[in-house]
Amino acid sequence: MDRKTMTISAWRQQLQNGDISSRELVDQHIERLETAEPSLSVYNEITVERARADADRIDAARAAGESLGPLAGLPLAIKDNLCTRGVRTTCSSRMLEHFVPPYESTATERLWQAGGVLVGKTNLDEFAMGGSTETSAFGATHNPWNLDHVPGGSSGGSAAAVASGSCIASLGSDTGGSIRQPASFCGVVGLKPTYGRVSRWGLVAFASSLDQVGPFATSVADAAELLQVIAGPDPRDSTCLNVEVPDYSAGLNQSIKGLKVGVIKECFDAKGLDGEVNASVRAAAAQLEALGAELVEVSCPRFNDGIATYYVIAPSEASANLARYDGVKYGFRAADAESLATMTSSSRAEGFGEEVQRRILIGTYALSAGYVDAYYKKAQQVRTLIRRDFDAAFQSVDVLLTPTAPSPAFKAGAHKDDPLAMYLADLLTIPVNLAGLPAISVPCGFSQTGLPIGVQLIGNVLDEARLLQVAHQYEQAADVLSQRPKAPLVP
C-alpha cells in the first residue's frame, strides 16, 4: 500500500467505482492489522466480526443504490477511552478491564452514522495519563518506525494504528498533547480541535476542562473530513459549543500568500530542544514563507509556564473525576475486603496503576484545605495569563508555529524512573490545551536515525478551517513522506 493512495477520498472513489468492495477493503486492513499486531501491540480489542458484518451491510446498501455517508465502508480505529456500545472500553486500566458501555459516545456515533467501520479499540496510557503508551495495564505499544522507541502518548495506539496501515484513520483524545505528540512520533497528522468543537459525551474523563476528541490521519485533507463528521453541537455535553460547523475541506487548496505565521520565540529557545527538530521545524517555516506566507517572530512570555500550570490543574480534575471508581457500582473490586472502607481503598490501590495514583495524589493535595489557594487557584490565574499571551499574538498573526515535541520518539523505558522527564515531552503542546485553542501536528522531516519529526500549527478559537488550509498547503509543497526512510511496519 502506498500511503498516497490510502486517503479517504481515494478509497471512497474506488468504492464508488466498484474497483473494490467494502468487505475487501476491510479484509485488507484486518490482514495488515493481524500481521503487525504481534510486533506493535496497538489494539486492546479487535472487532473482526463486527467490521465484516458492517462492510457486508454497506456493500448491500451500495448495490441497492441507497445513499451512503462520506465514510461508508472505511475501516477506523478508536482510542479505548471513547465509549462504544457493546464493545469493551477499558481506558487501558485494570479498573475498567471488563467494562462494556451501554451507550455510544457522540463522536463515535457520528462516525458510524457516516458509514465508518470499527476495526478495533486502541491502546493508550492508563486513563490517558502519560506520554508514551507505556503505562497501559495491558502492555506498551511500540513505534512502527522503530520498535525500540515509543509511539508517544497518551493516544499512542491510535497514532501507531494509522502509521502501520491497520486502519485508514482513527480517533484519539488530547488533554495536554495526547494527539499531537504521538502524531509527531509516528509520522502522521494529528488534530486537536478547539475546546468544545467536538462533543466529549462518552469520552471517559481525565481533565474535563482540557480534554478534547480529535482525529489521526495520513493527510490533512483526511483530518478535515473526519472533523467535518464529528464536530458540532451536542445537547448532552454542556461544554460543546452551539455554533455552525463550516466546510473544512472547501478552503484547503486556497493560497496562503499574505497570511502571517507567528514563530513563537520561547519554543525555539526551550531547554532540551533537539537540534534535528529545530532544523526540521525551521525548514517547515521557510517552506511556508516560500508559499507566500509572512513569518513574524512573536513572544508568548508565559508559554514555558504551561507545564507547571497543567500539572496542578489536570491532576486536580483527575482526582475529582476518578473518585467514582470505588469498587461499588462498576469497575474492578478487590476481593476479601473486611469493610466498605478497605474495599474502596484496596480496589483503587489494585485497580489503578502507578502513574494514575501519582496524579490523583498530586491533585488531591492541590485541592486540599490550606493548599487550594497556593496551588489550584494560582494555577488557574496563570492559565488565564497564558491565554492572554495567545490572544495578544493573534492580534498580529493568523496562525502560530512551533515544534510539536522537543525531540523525536524516545526509547522505550528511557523515562521509566523519571516522570518529570516524561512530562517535559508535552512542553510545547500543553499551553494550547490550557488556552482551548485548535492545533495540528504535520510531519516535517526525519531524524538521522529515521524517526519522524512534526511541526505544530496553532489556530485561533474555532479557526480550524484556516489552520487546516495552512497545514494542507505546507503538506502538499513539502511532500515529506515521499522522502521517508524505509520501515518494515510502515506501508
Curated annotation (Swiss-Prot):
Protein's name according to its UniProt entry: Glutamyl-tRNA(Gln) amidotransferase subunit A
Keywords carried by this UniProt record: ATP-binding, Ligase, Nucleotide-binding, Protein biosynthesis
Function as written in the Swiss-Prot or TrEMBL entry: Allows the formation of correctly charged Gln-tRNA(Gln) through the transamidation of misacylated Glu-tRNA(Gln) in organisms which lack glutaminyl-tRNA synthetase. The reaction takes place in the presence of glutamine and ATP through an activated gamma-phospho-Glu-tRNA(Gln).
Source species of the chain: Synechococcus sp. (strain CC9902)
Family membership noted in the UniProt record: Belongs to the amidase family. GatA subfamily.
Molecular function, one GO term: glutaminyl-tRNA synthase (glutamine-hydrolyzing) activity
Higher taxonomy: Bacteria, Bacillati, Cyanobacteriota, Cyanophyceae, Synechococcales
SUPFAM superfamilies the record matches: Amidase signature (AS) enzymes (SSF75304)
Recorded superkingdom: Bacteria
InterPro entries for this protein: Amidase, Amidase_CS, Amidase_dom, AS_sf, GatA
GO annotation, cellular component aspect: glutamyl-tRNA(Gln) amidotransferase complex
EC number assigned by the record: 6.3.5.7
